[in-house]
Amino acid sequence: MTDLERLQAWLETYPRAGELTSYQVDYTDQLPGCFGVFPAGMVEVERTENLLGQVTVQNQYNFALYVVFAKAPGDTEGAQINADWVMDFQQWVQEQSVLRKAPTFGNIDQHRERLRAENGALYDAELTGTAMYMVRLAATFWKHY
């Protein structure tokens, strides 16, 4: 299973995932209930080498999660419901990471790995009655070579 497949399988365990209907990578339909994960690459944060030449690398995967909900222009109640979903999702990610239930990506120090959901916000709203929200996902992990 690839790292992206593990992330997807884990996202589907979110208790409110049933409110979403269609999962895609690098794309999402502009229909309520659709969501997409957009991988934004890996960043090497730090690299250390010991006296034996063994290398440990701290990495960070970055993803953007886009979710489309119904929201008519001026619909404050719908906006509140959508914002509550986004905030609940971010809290769930934090809880899963703290309890070590989130997916891990490294080959050492997996107890130190951290998955964060940050900066959830309205990304775009259409006059047709949909709104797209974006949450940044970041996974910090270590690899030993």
Regions found by a protein language model. Give the residues of each.
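Charged, amphipathic alpha-helical segments and their flanking helix caps
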Residues: 1-27, 43-145
